[in-house]
């Protein structure tokens, strides 16, 4: 029986294990695939759960078609404890699909496939918790307080991914969470309160080391389940923010956990090969514009582009130092907000130009980046965010229910389509006519 200890007592680095059907690696050089570089991401309002209702499955499929994107990051809630998610957990911790929600997700995927998407990245927006647990959302058991519940939590979520892989064979890339490193918002102990001040939430926030350990445990167990379904399935790191990780210490801590011979938790061995935890490096390289005052995003100075480029090169260097030079990277969120300046033509054009500059740099200096998922498809009308001027005004299209620009493409949408050779003026005109505000 596996011992519930963090430190494994057998250091399992045997090649015979690494090369089984459940694990890959063995030092072969990875061939980067850039066919799917242009990606998009947005949750669907058709799934419910507080997402803007104007962002429908049909609309997202039409957006994919008019843009010509081949990659899409799916946002799915796997926890049905509130009635709106993928799985139910029974008293024996067995899982069953919520058939109504499952049908909506199939429609989400099918509409995107209709729009030409071939490369999917699956993101779960919540975690599953054991039946008798009081946890919800992004709550994670504290392994130091309740190791049994922690291990059950890890295995339950891994099992869910295996069931999803069987249900959605067209999805080959699987993300294990979103921004767990962002101050507790994406991963925390039970008792964390969204919107509360830091003094109240401090006892419920994991340390960076603890977050890295949870990431490694989830990734290892999930990868094992996914590979058992299809060897082509790949696990990505959860979409790391890294926005405040200026010295890259958090990113490096993931490798430190793997190399410390303390992971995965609950096994009678340690596994020190990063390939057995994740196949894709995944983070959100938003540009740090905090130092610039309004008007935002005019023309970024050259030194800002240099700083941004060097940051990505430094992150890749850390991965290379730990044996992951040839591991692909996904930028699972990247984009610009107009902070509500919707009528500022210069601003909109400069945002469009900034996308092109970023893609030029990526193509020239970052061959390991396989997909950039532009965040997001549309501005928000019905879904309100706490920092609404910023969060609600990402999007390369105007929301179809925008009172002034309903259904129109922003300059960035057309510029990106032109850049990737998918622009069709007739398609854009037909799209805008279909969704214009009546």
Residue ranges with predicted function:
Residues 28-77:
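Boundary/entry segment of secreted carbohydrate-active catalytic domains
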Residues 38-42, 70-74, 119-123, 174-176, ...:
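Hydrophobic faces of well-ordered beta-strands that scaffold small-molecule active sites
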Residues 66-245, 288, 337, 384:
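Substrate-binding cleft and catalytic face of glycoside hydrolase catalytic domains
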Residues 154, 205-348:
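Noncatalytic carbohydrate-binding groove/subsite architecture in carbohydrate-active enzymes
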